[in-house]
Amino acid sequence: ITXGQVTGSLAPXIAFLRTK
């Protein structure tokens, strides 16, 4: 499980792009 999973709950797309 990554952190992104928690933030992704609200905006997976945005969170994924911001992580990159």
Swiss-Prot record:
Alphabetical keyword list: Allergen, Lipid-binding, Transport
Keyword presence, Transport: yes
One MF annotation (Gene Ontology) recorded for this entry: lipid binding
Domain of life of the source: Eukaryota
Family to which this protein belongs: Belongs to the plant LTP family.
Role description: Plant non-specific lipid-transfer proteins transfer phospholipids as well as galactolipids across membranes. May play a role in wax or cutin deposition in the cell walls of expanding epidermal cells and certain secretory tissues.
Name of this chain's protein: Non-specific lipid-transfer protein
Protein's organism: Citrus sinensis
